[in-house]
A protein has these predicted regions:
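Sec/Tat signal peptide C-region and signal peptidase I cleavage site
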Residues: 20-26
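Bacterial N-terminal signal peptides that target proteins for export
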Residues: 1-14
Length: 307
């Protein structure tokens, strides 16, 4: 009898804990958020979006979901961010530099050689400074749910090996559509050319540009090794993405629904950083196997990139 009573008590306790652990299902409505990204469906960013969708579904009893649209199907970073502000798209994950035209302090994150390693970046982005940046977004029609890692950026090109900072001079490099990127690379003597990411592969294939700059994971996933011979480990900038949701969408959610989205976003952020860092460790080896010639700038040469 005592055993039966104990079992019943434990079962009741478990039921109560389950009820307290998540919002009441009846208070959560059905929502499907379209998430547009410029990168390919097999990129680590896309994997993290799918993880976010899984966590949304699990936490909402299947009522909330996120649907991925990859490879620029819904536009580029600039146009998709604009769509969020207008309320015609629910979510996107642009490079932080995309937000500089709306909020200038976001440009600080893309200054050359700002961070020495990922731990420093995490401390800044997850700390008071990063949170202050996110707090500026609602006035622009956006809600920031966290910072995802793109990684340290490196230069590739089809013309020559880069062994010194001066070797960059004269190269026509595609850069992000941001005044900061344009000014930085023009100062280094390159012909900086702003261009949507979705147009980049074809532009390199047709020799419209000599090269570009991105982290190893993106270089590999986008198969840039097919049209680029040289990669220099320049580590000239650390690049972060911002997980965004439209404020119009956000304002239409209940308190319980917002909590679910925030919790799923936090878990997806941890997943994304872990996944892309693990992949980046192997990406350089894969790029070398694919035929890319990889050089590394000496510390003294890298310091010259701090323009």
């Amino acid at each position: 009898m005592q055993f039966t009573s104990l079992a019943k008590s434990l079962a009741l306790g478990a039921t109560l804990l389950a009820a307290l652990a998540a919002p009441v299902a009846a208070q959560v409505k059905e929502h499907t958020f379209k998430v547009g990204i410029g990168l390919s469906d097999d990129h680590q960013q896309a994997q993290a979006v799918r993880h976010f969708a899984e966590r949304l579904q699990a936490k909402s009893g299947g009522k909330m979901n996120a649907k991925l649209f990859a490879s620029g199907a819904l536009g580029n970073d600039v146009s998709m961010t604009s769509a969020l502000r207008g309320g015609t798209l629910e979510m996107t994950i642009p490079d932080s530099s995309t937000l500089m035209s709306l909020i200038k302090p976001f440009g600080v994150l893309n200054l050359p050689l700002t961070f020495n390693n990922e731990a420093e970046a995490d401390a800044v982005l997850d700390g008071p400074f990063g949170q202050k940046l996110l707090a500026m977004l609602p006035d622009k029609g956006l809600i920031g749910l966290g910072f995802w890692e793109n990684g340290f950026r490196h230069v590739t090109n089809s013309r020559r090996a880069i062994n010194t900072a001066d070797d960059l001079a004269g190269l026509k490099l595609r850069v992000i559509q941001s005044p900061l990127f344009l000014d930085t690379f023009n100062a280094l003597g390159t012909n900086a050319t702003p261009m949507p990411f979705t147009e980049l592969y074809t532009a390199m294939e047709q020799k419209a540009v000599d090269g570009q700059e991105n982290p190893p994971a993106t270089i590999l996933a986008s198969k840039f090794y097919e049209v680029q011979k040289h990669l220099v480990l320049s580590r000239h900038m650390y690049s972060a993405w911002v997980l965004l949701i439209s404020k119009k969408t956000w304002d239409g959610l209940s308190a319980d629904e917002k909590k679910i989205v925030q919790e799923a976003a936090r878990e997806a952020t941890v997943f994304e950083r872990k996944t892309i860092r693990a992949f980046s460790e192997t990406a350089l080896g894969e790029l070398k196997k694919a035929g890319m010639q990889i050089t590394e700038l000496p510390a003294a040469e890298q310091a010259k990139l701090r323009t």
